[in-house]
């Protein structure tokens, strides 16, 4: 048996997994206190701010692309819908896995199914994430059925596919916005630059923009590493829609700050103001400015760079809401422990590995890796023989 070639990135991957395995052992057998720098003043850290808030946001490409293709009939984007679906499905599985580390008693998570509190935003988020992950699994089944040539179950799942797409869009819309609603109960704790009654709306708009940015990012990375061609017209089209969503987000965000008379906080010499401008600069100000030039918005390589900026900016946004905006009230500066970071990196590394294996062995892209033979073979072409040769 031939051993895999040792490369730099494979070595990094193994080291991340080993550190994550050790941190997982410490977390399970010694508890949250030994693994994290969380406290009563800072009960939510990187596992909530990044793994949950950012993880759910970064997985938004699934509902964005599936809505475009199957609801708004933008069939030209169908070749990149499956990679977006795979990213969404993996993203939610990893979000659930990461949540288990943050819960003091993870086995109690099942109680959300039986102990209902309809007035709780967290109850709604829990149910929506659970149901949406189930819907994503059902939407992903046709890919598995195609790979193993299971014609009958494939026909059955396709009959209910439209219902699944509609359910997925509704559920994703609900909990993407509800993650913002979680912070509406802390008006005196969250910094004015981030606290607003419009937080659920801003979370949803940014999720749509990030879904498009993630699709551009993953399409570019997949083309580079898996050797298939990059669909330039599709990437350019996604870039134009992303520009529109970023403009909408930027207008709503800045208008909200101005209307609530808190914009002056952005110009004070504070740590919060610095983080706000980093978030705004990377998230929408610089991307909008760059994409106003045709040579940027019509070039896939430059759109890839813009998508990295957008992703970085909105990841900062979620971390600012979860951590930076709370530090002024708590009086503590939260710096995650290395074991927290190693577990987060391990979750991300496992996700990248599973994505790579799925692309290799399943029909994710319209051509190339993992593509099975057609379920119905085309007829053999007939050879025409001239009458004079008979």
Regions found by a protein language model. Give the residues of each.
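Membrane-interface helix-loop junction between the first two transmembrane segments
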Residues: 25-42, 71-74
């Amino acid at each position: 048996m031939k051993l895999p070639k040792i490369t730099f990135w494979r070595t990094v991957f193994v080291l991340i997994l080993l550190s994550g395995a050790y941190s997982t052992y410490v977390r399970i057998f010694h508890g949250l206190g030994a693994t994290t720098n969380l406290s009563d003043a800072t009960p939510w850290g990187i596992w909530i701010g990044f793994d949950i808030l950012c993880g759910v946001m970064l997985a938004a490409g699934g509902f964005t692309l599936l809505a475009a293709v199957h609801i708004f009939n933008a069939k030209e984007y169908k070749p990149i819908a499956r990679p977006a679906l795979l990213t969404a499905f993996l993203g939610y599985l990893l979000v659930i896995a990461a949540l288990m580390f943050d819960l003091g008693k993870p086995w109690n998570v099942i109680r959300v199914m039986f102990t209902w509190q309809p007035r709780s935003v967290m109850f709604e988020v829990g149910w929506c994430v659970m149901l949406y992950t189930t819907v994503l699994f059902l939407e992903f089944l046709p890919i598995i059925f195609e790979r193993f040539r299971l014609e009958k179950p494939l026909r059955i799942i396709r009959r209910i596919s439209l219902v699944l797409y509609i359910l997925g869009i509704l559920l994703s819309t609900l909990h993407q916005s509800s993650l913002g609603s979680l912070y509406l109960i802390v008006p005196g704790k969250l910094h004015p630059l981030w606290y607003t009654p419009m937080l659920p709306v801003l979370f949803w708009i940014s999720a749509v923009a990030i879904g498009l940015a993630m699709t551009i990012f993953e399409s570019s990375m997949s083309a580079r590493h898996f050797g298939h061609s990059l669909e330039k017209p599709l990437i350019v089209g996604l870039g134009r829609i992303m520009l529109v969503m970023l403009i909408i987000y930027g207008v709503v965000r800045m208008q909200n700050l101005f209307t609530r008379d808190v914009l002056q906080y952005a110009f004070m010499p504070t740590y919060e103001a610095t983080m706000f401008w980093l978030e705004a600069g990377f998230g929408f100000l610089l991307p909008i400015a760059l994409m106003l030039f045709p040579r940027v918005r019509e070039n896939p390589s430059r759109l890839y760079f813009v998508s990295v900026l957008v992703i970085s900016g909105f990841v900062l946004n979620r971390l600012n809401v979860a951590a930076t905006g709370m530090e002024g009230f708590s009086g503590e500066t939260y710096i995650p422990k290395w074991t927290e970071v190693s577990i987060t990196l391990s979750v991300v590394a496992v996700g990248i590995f599973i994505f790579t294996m799925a692309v290799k062995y399943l029909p994710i892209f319209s051509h190339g890796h993992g593509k099975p033979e057609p379920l119905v073979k085309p007829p053999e072409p007939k050879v025409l023989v001239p009458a004079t040769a008979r």
